[in-house]
């Protein structure tokens, strides 16, 4: 599963994990991606989205219809 949020566009970040002795190792910071299924009244069907925790909060505030409309406007197939 790709670590990419369909709502916010959050992607993995890269950096270092630093030990107590300050030795650095490359690591990847993944967003908190969840697979969520929503009922979309305007489409009259369920839509499964890969969303981050922040994306879930965005859907709660803006509403699923507005979020799905913006995703479809970008040309993403649901």
Curated annotation (Swiss-Prot):
Annotated region (Disordered), positions in chain: 1-31
Database matches in SUPFAM superfamilies: L28p-like (SSF143800)
One example GO MF annotation: structural constituent of ribosome
Pfam families: Ribosomal_L28
Keywords: Ribonucleoprotein, Ribosomal protein
A GO-annotated cellular component: ribonucleoprotein complex
Domain of life: Bacteria
GO biological process, one term: translation
HAMAP family: Ribosomal_bL28
Family, similarity comment: Belongs to the bacterial ribosomal protein bL28 family.
Name assigned to this protein: Large ribosomal subunit protein bL28
Organism of origin: Pseudarthrobacter chlorophenolicus (strain ATCC 700700 / DSM 12829 / CIP 107037 / JCM 12360 / KCTC 9906 / NCIMB 13794 / A6)
Gene label: rpmB
